[in-house]
Amino acid sequence: MTDTRNGEDNGKLLYCSFCGKSQHEVRKLIAGPSVFICDECVDLCNDIIREEVQEAQAESSAHKLPSPKEISGILDQYVIGQERAKKVLAVAVYNHYKRLNQRDKKGDEVELGKSNILLIGPTGSGKTLLAETLARLLNVPFTIADATTLTEAGYVGEDVENIIQKLLQKCDYDVEKAQMGIVYIDEIDKISRKSDNPSITRDVSGEGVQQALLKLIEGTVASVPPQGGRKHPQQEFLQVDTRNILFICGGAFSGLEKVIQQRSTRGGIGFSAEVRSKEEGKKVGESLREVEPDDLVKFGLIPEFVGRLPVLATLDELDEAALIQILTEPKNALTKQYAKLFEMEGVDLEFRTDALKSVAKRALERKTGARGLRSILEGVLLDTMYEIPSQSEVSKVVIDESVIEGKSKPLYIYENSEPTAKAAPDA
């Protein structure tokens, strides 16, 4: 095979046998027995082969469903604590995709139902992270929707079918892939009924949205405009069957623990009164573990909606020790992320133990759980990240408790010199 660049052989102009471009229109023309191929067609062939290999790998990995123990083990690498929730999720997700792998087999008279999941836990306890990690592990399309932005059809706001549109966007509008995806609906507690008594007044963002979501979650054929276009009568829609999409709903459900305590301590004098005082002394997480479907109905979810979320998993409120673990142990721990950023500048970043404790305490005071850790560290390290790229002689930065509390600035250690601390800010 020969490489023809200018190809003035016999004064004849040469062309690519595949795309028809001349040798002057491409960078390189490769000659074979009576044929030529240009560099652009070679690149195109490589892309086609690469896509086919990736699709084959994705199909083979889809058939290799990890066991519940394996799923839980991978979740352990990213989510600290919440062992019960991880176990519940691992079993539910395993059974869901096992059901999908069985659905096309003939001769099986038992029809397996879908088990959607409801996650209940305080803000920043890991609900969204659990759902994200599951989708990444299973290599399926995943999208997050905020229930507070949803309204009934015909009202200003997001239509519930927009959720399916977002899922389609995640997989380049491949309907087959989307129908195997996972949807996480956050803040589901915010669309609860304002009271547990049915009302004749219109509740645009509450019960009405629950009714609309009900159809989507239990299984319907949603009509979605192609490539994100607006709906109009003459348009052809993509038809997406939601029967096999796994829906995971999550919410903090603030006040639900009181509903549970009222149920478990209803009435009572004498000895019962003593039991009631013990119930009231329970932590929120302990109370939430005793949740029953009737409690959710009392909270404001309609019975039909609760019935479509048969798998309940509760998450505990994170304490100081758990927050410190979150800062240091997971694969994507924040201290590891910031250390990597500093490493790119040739600088070591060290967090002292007292600094980690101080960060955890501040997050607890803000009641933001793990979600607030990044904003705390970002604020503490902002000035340092601003200065470091301009100071090539700095080899190490040390963060201690006084830095987190704003009493002093980080300790800078310079190459071939003694450690020096920046001057403390003016009081």
UniProtKB/Swiss-Prot annotation:
PANTHER family: ATP-DEPENDENT CLP PROTEASE ATP-BINDING SUBUNIT CLPX-LIKE, MITOCHONDRIAL, ATP-DEPENDENT CLP PROTEASE ATP-BINDING SUBUNIT CLPX-LIKE, MITOCHONDRIAL-RELATED. Zn(2+) binds at C16, C19, C38, C41. One of its GO terms (biological process) is proteolysis involved in protein catabolic process. CDD domains: RecA-like_ClpX. Pfam families: AAA_2, ClpB_D2-small, zf-C4_ClpX. ATP-dependent specificity component of the Clp protease. It directs the protease to specific substrates. Can perform chaperone functions in the absence of ClpP. Belongs to the ClpX chaperone family. HAMAP family: ClpX (MF_00175). It comes from Pseudomonas fluorescens (strain SBW25). Keywords: ATP-binding, Chaperone, Metal-binding, Nucleotide-binding, Zinc. One of its GO terms (cellular component) is HslUV protease complex. GO terms for molecular function: ATP binding; ATP hydrolysis activity; ATP-dependent protein folding chaperone; protein dimerization activity; unfolded protein binding; zinc ion binding. ATP binds at P122, T123, G124, S125, G126, K127, T128, L129. Residues 4-57 form the ClpX-type ZB domain. Component of the ClpX-ClpP complex. Forms a hexameric ring that, in the presence of ATP, binds to fourteen ClpP subunits assembled into a disk-like structure with a central cavity, resembling the structure of eukaryotic proteasomes. This is ATP-dependent Clp protease ATP-binding subunit ClpX. NCBIfam families: clpX, PRK05342.1. Transmembrane segments: none annotated. Signal peptide: none annotated.
